[in-house]
């Protein structure tokens, strides 16, 4: 969800066969078909089930929050579906849930080295704690007074139940069976750090593919995890497993994003991280449409206390909010920051607007139809085009036109990744240009371009333009080392385009000028004091150092 852990069918024809006529409105449904209840901001799926007598739990029962403490503070009674017989742990056909116990005697011990410093850490111990009561239910398990007092049992119950809710949504409504096997889930993750003398959790959760578990967190005991996993931590104030919106988000990564929309690729504008942003956008959207709440992490990601190496600090006044509100309209490229969670808000705001326009059922169908066609090299342009086409295929030209207008309002159709320099830093994020160590072999000759390029408007009569970067090389412990950066400048509003040949170092670009940045600045000036062409200019930054370049602001002065 947030980036603090050491972390990120029916088939298309069958989408229409699961309750939606491809050329009718959202409410035109065959009365003989079983239709899932419409989920609105005021009605959750659990509330629909509890309010209808025929849907009351008949199997193993438990108390859960429909969404999260403070969002839906009253507990509801639910059936824990798909549990294996004899129902003695949170293991079923589609989930294997454990919580992680803080136990210094049984925890796995290891050492981590950071330069001259070595610390010893002890992993928490994964185990299943939930057991049914004498009546065969789990109603005796209730939320702890505070997350700090949680023994793992309520976290396991919350996790298990909401995994079934989102699994059954994808399967029963849309026929997706990719997760028809037990997905691993681990709650309450924390580690003991000897220099801190405390158990430290983090404000995060993550979906981790099976192949990535060994590299996920050094020292974490993952031996009991038998495949892909969703892993949740938290603090004494926030247990991320208590927030259904976070569970749905991570489960959607497992369902929709596990085989597509991962990583970064190179294209004709440099490095493109937007597949990861789309992965986050779809995870946010399907979480929000399931809860009916357009903000992801109202409980888990709001008023988070400041943290450091040892966990939450004593500075209770230093809190931050990372909840993502899908109603907040953002635009490409002005709001891009080359961080996938933040960049995702541009696209997810469009998806939520589609839901507001057409309702949950019709919008979900349009959105999923497109998402299942995407690949690891799909970006905002591709996803917008596929969603518009999907709306046309499923519901006709009028619906498609409205979807296109929603994307156009956010400049998501044909958006070049050129950020106006006055927007750099506007979202309080440092922009990154990766170092050469990220590529081996490197397709670029001795440099790495950024995820973004930058636009500047030169006034008429300008003879000299000076571009200054507020930037640092290397980030943590950089010690003020000088930048090793070139600026490739191009006249006009088009991006600098890259072309790739065969082998390492074969990339070329169509920039007009290349300047070496000295003292964090470069100057554009014609010979003989000839004025520069007025209007839009574009430049790309090429990092020639091994470590990351971080940019807080870019300014321009004209003479």
PLM features: what roles do these ranges have?
Residues 1-22:
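Sec-dependent N-terminal signal peptides
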Residues 9, 365-367, 511-513:
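Short secondary-structure subsegments characteristic of cysteine-rich extracellular domains
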Residues 18-247, 254-449, 464-466, 471-482, ...:
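Zymogen propeptides/activation segments of proteases
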Residues 453:
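Enzyme catalytic cores with a strong preference for nitrogen-chemistry domains
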Residues 498-514:
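Solvent-exposed serine/threonine-rich low-complexity stretches and specific carbohydrate-binding patches
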């Amino acid at each position: 969800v947030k980036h603090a852990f050491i972390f990120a069918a029916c088939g298309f024809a069958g989408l229409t066969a699961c309750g939606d006529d491809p050329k009718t409105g959202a409410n035109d449904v065959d009365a003989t078909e079983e239709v899932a209840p419409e989920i609105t901001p005021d009605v959750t799926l659990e509330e629909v089930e509890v309010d209808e007598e025929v849907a009351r739990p008949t199997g193993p029962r438990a108390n859960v929050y429909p969404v999260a403490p403070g969002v839906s503070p009253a507990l509801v009674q639910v059936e824990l579906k798909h549990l294996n017989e004899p129902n003695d742990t949170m293991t079923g056909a589609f989930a294997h849930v454990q919580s992680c116990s803080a136990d210094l005697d049984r925890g796995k011990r290891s050492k981590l080295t950071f330069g001259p410093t070595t610390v010893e850490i002890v992993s928490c111990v994964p185990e299943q704690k939930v057991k049914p009561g004498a009546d065969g239910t789990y109603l005796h398990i209730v939320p702890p007074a505070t997350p700090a007092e949680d023994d793992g049992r309520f976290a396991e119950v919350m996790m298990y139940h909401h995994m079934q809710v989102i699994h059954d949504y994808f399967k029963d409504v849309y026929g997706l069976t990719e997760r028809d096997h037990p997905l691993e889930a681990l709650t309450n993750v924390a580690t003991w750090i000897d220099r801190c003398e405390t158990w430290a959790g983090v404000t995060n959760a993550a979906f981790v593919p099976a192949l990535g578990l060994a590299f996920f967190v050094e020292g974490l005991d993952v031996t009991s995890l038998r495949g892909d996993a969703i892993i949740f931590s938290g603090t004494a104030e926030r247990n991320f497993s208590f927030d259904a919106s976070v569970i749905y988000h991570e489960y959607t990564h497992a369902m929709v994003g596990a085989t597509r929309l991962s990583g970064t690729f190179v294209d004709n504008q440099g490095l493109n991280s937007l597949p990861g942003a789309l992965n986050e956008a779809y995870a946010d959207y399907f979480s929000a449409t399931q809860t009916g709440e357009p903000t992801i992490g109202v409980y888990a990601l709001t008023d988070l206390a400041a943290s450091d190496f040892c966990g939450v600090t004593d500075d209770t006044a230093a809190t931050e909010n990372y909840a993502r509100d899908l109603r907040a309209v953002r635009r490409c490229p002005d709001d891009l920051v080359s961080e996938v969670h933040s960049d995702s808000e541009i696209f997810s705001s469009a998806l939520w607007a589609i839901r507001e326009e057409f309702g949950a059922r019709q919008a979900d169908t349009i959105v999923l139809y497109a998402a299942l066609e995407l690949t690891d090299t799909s970006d905002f342009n591709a996803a917008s085009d596929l969603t518009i086409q999907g709306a046309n295929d499923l519901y006709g030209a009028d619906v498609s036109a409205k979807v296109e207008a929603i994307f156009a309002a956010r400049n998501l159709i044909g958006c070049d990744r050129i950020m106006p320099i006055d927007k750099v830093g506007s979202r309080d994020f440092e922009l990154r240009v990766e170092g050469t160590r990220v590529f081996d072999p490197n397709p670029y000759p001795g440099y790495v371009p950024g995820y973004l390029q930058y636009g500047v408007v030169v006034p008429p009569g300008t003879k000299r333009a000076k571009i200054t970067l507020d930037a640092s090389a290397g980030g943590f412990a950089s010690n003020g080392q000088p930048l090793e950066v070139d600026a490739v400048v191009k006249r006009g509003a088009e991006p600098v385009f890259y072309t790739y040949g065969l082998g390492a170092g074969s990339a070329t670009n169509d920039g007009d000028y290349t300047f070496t940045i000295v003292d964090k600045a470069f100057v554009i000036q014609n010979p003989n004091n000839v004025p520069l062409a007025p209007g839009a200019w574009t430049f790309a930054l090429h990092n020639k150092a091994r470590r990351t370049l971080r940019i807080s602001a870019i300014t321009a002065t004209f003479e």
